[in-house]
Each structure stands twice: as structure tokens, then as C-alpha cells.
A protein has these predicted regions:
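S-adenosylmethionine
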Residues: 1-154
Length: 154
């Protein structure tokens, strides 16, 4: 699917890889201008389409997901060149997986948030998009729940 989308959109300098995102790849250190970390999540943002999610959720699973997300962010952060971009996204509305991960990441890595406004429709512009992140909510934004943050490496 990713390869199809790269071809469909005319991507010429895009490389999709199948690998374990929790395992460090030294050949990728500071090699990418942009890294997209679309991490595994609880899926609470798509619960309308997958109602079984609410029956499988537990506090322990939530903690495990957050730890997995942070392991992936740790590796992804190392692959971005100085002044490069890291995009972090989930399909959840859980604060622990979204805003709290952003705060954790900023505290532990040499990155800053960067405005999303130039990249999203004007009707989605708000205080948080100027800061560098956006939480889409079902019923408000006419979409599934989704979170995205844009980081710039210092």
C-alpha cells in the first residue's frame, strides 16, 4: 500500500522499508530529511468503525502501547538529519499516546515543534496547529480521530 501511494503521488526520492521500528538501524542514523512515525496505537480514534476496541482496552495495554510508541520515537529521532523533520501520528484520541508523548519527546530529544498551518486546510487552523500538533475528533471534524505532530530537529 505504501509503495502504491509513493508511485501514485510521483514520489521520486522516497524509500519505504519493512523493518522492526523498535530496532536501531545504524545505517539510517541522520540519513533522512523526513521521517514519518505512524506508530501503533490504541485505535480509540477509529472506535466508531471498530467497536471491539473498547472491549479489549485495559490500563496495562495502554501503558504498553505508550512504551512501544516511545521506543519507536526514540529510533525515529536518530534517523532525522539536523534541521530535518519528524512527523508523529496516531489514530487515537488518547492524551497519553498523543500530547503526553509530545511533551516526553521534547523533554528528551533535540527537537522543537513546528507549525502545521502551512500543510493543512485553513478550517483546521487553531492554537495547537500553530504550535505544531493537531487532534482531529470524530463528530467535530467529520473524520476519524487522528493526531499529528511535526517536529524539527535542532
Amino acid at each position: 500500500l505504501i509503495e502504491e501511494n509513493i508511485h501514485r503521488t510521483g514520489g521520486i526520492n522516497v524509500e519505504a522499508r519493512v523493518q522492526d521500528a523498535t530496532v536501531y538501524d545504524p545505517d539510517s542514523e541522520q540519513a533522512a530529511d523526513i521521517v514519518i512515525a505512524d506508530v501503533p496505537c490504541s485505535g480509540y480514534g477509529v472506535i466508531g468503525k471498530k467497536p471491539e476496541i473498547k472491549y479489549r482496552a485495559t490500563p496495562q495495554k495502554q501503558e504498553e502501547i505508550v512504551m512501544l510508541q516511545r521506543m519507536i520515537l526514540d529510533k525515529a529521532a536518530k534517523y532525522v538529519k539536523p534541521d530535518g523533520t519528524l512527523i508523529f501520528s496516531t489514530c487515537t484520541i488518547a492524551r497519553e499516546e498523543n500530547e503526553e508523548n509530545v511533551l516526553w519527546f521534547l523533554k528528551n530529544y533535540p527537537y522543537r515543534l513546528e507549525s502545521l498551518d502551512p500543510y493543512i486546510p485553513e478550517e483546521l487552523h487553531c492554537k495547537s496547529t500553530k504550535l505544531g500538533y493537531l487532534q482531529l475528533l470524530p463528530g467535530i471534524h467529520k473524520t476519524d480521530g487522528f493526531f499529528i505532530a511535526r517536529f524539527r530537529r535542532k
